[in-house]
């Protein structure tokens, strides 16, 4: 499983380079290990890969509308790059993959001023 990435806008806006590296280099390392060990791997992606959708509701094959140089691009594009690497490792190396796009999570250790939609509503 690969769930590593800052998800709070407050956090990832402070460390954009590290956030993007998790989505690219971290994923590359994870997939390389899965290939070497013939392991299955699942990544937790995000609804942010859709960006600001121009289509409602979005279908599974919707490509998204992400601003590649916007404030949140380090997170959005990192997740998009991660999904691309997953697909490419599957196609090129037959690594067994699963991609899940998780929307609006909340948990007991989430900071109340996290900056995500659920904590903002609460």
Region spans (language model):
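Substrate-binding strand-loop-helix patch
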Residues: 22, 108-119
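N-terminal Rossmann-like NAD(P)+-binding domain of SDR-like oxidoreductases, especially those catalyzing
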Residues: 1-108
């Amino acid at each position: 499983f690969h769930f590593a990435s800052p998800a709070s806008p407050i956090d990832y806006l402070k460390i954009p380079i590290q956030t993007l590296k998790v989505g690219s280099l971290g994923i590359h390392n994870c997939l390389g290990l899965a290939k070497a060990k013939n392991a299955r791997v699942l990544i937790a992606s995000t609804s942010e890969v859709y960006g600001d959708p121009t289509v409602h509701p979005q279908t599974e094959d919707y490509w998204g509308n992400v601003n590649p140089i916007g404030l949140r691009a380090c997170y959005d594009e990192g997740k998009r790059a991660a999904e691309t690497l997953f697909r490419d490792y599957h196609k090129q190396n037959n690594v067994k993959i699963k991609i899940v796009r998780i929307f609006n999570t909340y948990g007991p250790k989430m900071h109340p001023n996290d900056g995500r939609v659920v904590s903002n509503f609460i």
